[in-house]
Amino acid sequence: MDAEKMLEIDGSYLEGGGQALRNALSLSCILGKPVRVVKIRASRPSPGLSHQHLHGLNLLRDITNADVVGNYLLSSTVEFTPRTILDNTYRVETHTAASITLIYQMALPVLLFAGRPSRLIVSGGTNVDFAPPVEYMQEVLLPNLKHFGVSFDLKVQRYGFYPRGQGRCQLDVQPVTKLNSGKLVAFGRIKSVSGVAYCAGRLPVNIAIDMQQTAQREIHRLWPSQQCSIEPIKHSRQKAFHNGAGILMTVNTTSDVVLGASALGKKRIDGHVLGSEASCQLGDYMRKQVCVDDYMQDQLIIYMALAVGRSTMRTGKLTNHTRTAINVAEQMTGVKFDVAMEPGGQMLVSCKGLGHVNKLI
């Protein structure tokens, strides 16, 4: 590899987690730009590539037939030189509880620029800490990406929780010619507040019911006239082998705004606490009338950077994940993001996208 032609990304920027690596590699694949990522996950207790990041890296290597240096566990530097994006059926077996959704987060934007539809089957954790739950990807990410002209189908074949994992999902991706600009700035009126409270394994359904009742009670306390429908679910042994519990709540508005809030059970699971946590978070979004929630911010940056025309989102205080994503996108694409605070405290984030065109279709 020619080191002089390789763009270098500092993986320790701000939060120093995996965000810089994920976005840099995805953009490298899409744009055909070699990249070197250094100081990977420098701020984490175990710096360097984790199992999840290594699986994602090797997946992108396969998708683009890339040359890679540094693809081993705990590696702090990776050099990645992609070739063309290959549509195919890809399988990733993590053999751990590595996050399925974070692996999808790396691959989805890349497969959008393949020549034909692709399928990606991944085993690992569907609902694990420090990652979006799979329900969030289905119920919140998908409708948000529809603003950019993106379509995908995500099926959960089996749920998997920490520490054993063993979940399995299938993602089918339709390629695009280009990404439309997204305008997520008008909150509109609330149409519905809904969600799912789930438990699995040896955990009793009462935990899901506790989450449901507390979440609904909290929403009704804050908005007495607002209907809130949470479905309690106990997953069968065929659908989820091991213990796990959590809740995802969403709000849908007349302006096609979809916001999500979730909570995940840890070792000692209290359904009332989880229900309160998710409903309070969602209630805060509703009160501030943001159009993009805190966990969607960073995921939209790569699509805004690549889209044709100017994209804008109204959100809350920018997370370090989002600031990192902006930093990487600006270096990789040359676009400029504008961030302004509004009188109500919301942040308006916009950029004129690169207008990247899929030449494989």
UniProtKB/Swiss-Prot annotation:
GO biological process entries: negative regulation of axon regeneration; RNA processing
Gene inactivation effect: Severed axons of RNAi-mediated knockdown class III dendritic arborization (da) neurons, display increased regeneration.
Keywords recorded for this protein, A-Z: ATP-binding, Ligase, Nucleotide-binding, Nucleus
Subcellular location: Nucleus, Nucleoplasm; Nucleus
UniProt GO MF annotations: ATP binding; RNA-3'-phosphate cyclase activity
Catalytic activity: a 3'-end 3'-phospho-ribonucleotide-RNA + ATP = a 3'-end 2',3'-cyclophospho-ribonucleotide-RNA + AMP + diphosphate
Catalytic residue positions: 321 (tele-amp-histidine intermediate)
Residues binding ATP, per UniProt: 105, 132, 295, 298-299, 321
Entry similarity comment: Belongs to the RNA 3'-terminal cyclase family. Type 1 subfamily.
Listed PANTHER family: RNA 3' TERMINAL PHOSPHATE CYCLASE, RNA 3'-TERMINAL PHOSPHATE CYCLASE
Function as written in the Swiss-Prot or TrEMBL entry: Catalyzes the conversion of 3'-phosphate to a 2',3'-cyclic phosphodiester at the end of RNA. The mechanism of action of the enzyme occurs in 3 steps: (A) adenylation of the enzyme by ATP; (B) transfer of adenylate to an RNA-N3'P to produce RNA-N3'PP5'A; (C) and attack of the adjacent 2'-hydroxyl on the 3'-phosphorus in the diester linkage to produce the cyclic end product. Likely functions in some aspects of cellular RNA processing.
Record-linked NCBIfam families: RNA_3prim_cycl
Name this protein carries in UniProt: RNA 3'-terminal phosphate cyclase
Taxonomic source organism: Drosophila melanogaster
Name of the gene encoding the protein in the UniProt record: Rtca
